[in-house]
Amino acid sequence: MKNINFNNTQSYQDLKNHFRKIKNIHLRDLFASDLNRFKKFSIIFENEMLIDFSKNRITDETLIYLLNLAKETDVKSGIKLMFSGAKINKTENRSVLHIALRNRTNRPIILNNCNIMLEVNALLEKMKNFSKMVIHGEWKGYTGKSISNVVNIGIGGSDLGPYMVTEALRPYKNHLNMYYVSNIDGTHLTEVLKKINPENTIFLIASKTFTTDETITNAHSAKKWFLHYSQDQSTLDKHFFALSANIKNALNFGININNIFKFWDWVGGRFSLWSSAGLSIMLSIGFDNFEKFLDGAHAMDNHFYHTNYKENIPILLALISIWYTNFFGSETEAIFPYDQYMHRFSAYFQQSNMESNGKSINRNGQRINYQTGPIIWGEPGTNGQHAFYQLIHQGTRLIPCDFIAPVFSHNDLNNHHMKLISNFFAQTQALAFGQSRDSILHRLILSKKNQDDIKRILPFKICKGNQPTNSILIRKITPYNLGALIALYEHKIFVQGYILNIFSFDQWGVELGKELSQNIYNYLNINIKNKSYDASTEGLINFYKSFMI
């Protein structure tokens, strides 16, 4: 890996100089001066997905400098390292091989002198056989009833990803009721337990380490609830399953060895939906649709690996993101799926991006003096239009946005989808081109308002525009297309981290809070005080404890 700070490259200096020239150019002028702009700055993926990046504040020259940055930092070598199984997660000494889980060509991937595809295929076969038994009613609960409810207990990647995909592919869902429990707040589990019957429910305990406090606490409570009804430890074999790399801990919990679906340390948690952690997805949509989901991701993997810099969608989107965070000074990026089934998509990539690239130390162990990962947020359209779009249109911040929409809806109710897609098109147009003073003045004059009213209201109606967007139009949200879309964003995040000279596959910042939490829990629970707390924390603890007397 080339461990160079990107702001020490010639490309960075070129971009810095170039930015001074174009920072005030308006998108109106960029489109007016180039009638082929859309054609030049858009790519179609497999005739299923259009990526339009023409409404970005870039020129042909910008793109040349950005692509030079990718070449100078040797992104293609980084891609090859990841796909080959090199241990690019240096701080944990691990390979990063979620791409192996969707390697549909069965190309051998050698790790520690073993072809890991043999294990991957064996796991997929085990998941397939189990899911078919559950879906077809052949897997019985302890009283002989077929399974109707599936409860996935996990957090982070073991929850956000599977939950997002299950919701996004709800049109492909079978009869099984899917529930997801993540929060250690007892309310989350309690509300799910109210809805289910222990006789026809299975629990999937999704934890790579099988030590995650939130997950194991919820799992123990679910187990206690279940045994209250079954009154027999052996009945756990019919109802509890582990999706984990830690076989020993799963066995100690009481999970039957045959009920453990393996995980590997080369699969990062936030990429785990492709692994056994995706069992809830398979149970929801069936094995055939899950295979199509993997196929779509694999197709994007091939595009990412084989396509040149200039036409490589993840590379282009990553470069454009870096352009805004490090030259325009934008702090956030928004993702707006115009599809209600995709309502958890933004939240999933909030975790995936911010946990991956929320770093301030470079790969050489030195503090960074430039911006790394942006803050990711978003909601489905059109809800967001009536909540926060106002700030994007007329606020003081530059917020690059991704708009995602299907051409065909799964629920084309009357003319609902045409109205939805009209909003999609209108918002990207309004953000790019705005509404100038002259056009507003003309409309106000035509409305026959008096001069005083026009003068008073005119400044407030101006929308400056020049807000950048990417538009991603997908023929339909199918398992295949969703798989490709998720892989696109995953690879975009990888490229960003690689260029920014950070390790994208660890999350040490998450660990500190866990450690402190355990110390405080010991103090609250058994009055063991391991250390002195700051005045604020001490005051908060004392206030809490005053109610426990």
From Swiss-Prot:
GO cellular component, one term: cytosol
Membrane-crossing segments per the record: none
GO molecular function (one): carbohydrate derivative binding
Localization terms from the record: Cytoplasm
UniProt keyword annotation of Cytoplasm present: yes
Family the UniProt entry places it in: Belongs to the GPI family.
Coiled-coil zones: none
Protein name: Glucose-6-phosphate isomerase
Keyword Cytoplasm: yes
InterPro entries: G6P_Isomerase, G6P_Isomerase_C, Phosphoglucose_isomerase_CS, SIS_dom_sf, SIS_PGI_1, SIS_PGI_2
Top EC class, one word: isomerase
UniProt keyword terms in alphabetical order: Cytoplasm, Gluconeogenesis, Glycolysis, Isomerase
EC number: 5.3.1.9
Pathway stated in the Swiss-Prot or TrEMBL entry: Carbohydrate biosynthesis; gluconeogenesis; Carbohydrate degradation; glycolysis; D-glyceraldehyde 3-phosphate and glycerone phosphate from D-glucose: step 2/4
Catalysis performed (reactions): alpha-D-glucose 6-phosphate = beta-D-fructose 6-phosphate
Function: Catalyzes the reversible isomerization of glucose-6-phosphate to fructose-6-phosphate.
Active site residues per record: 355, 386, 514
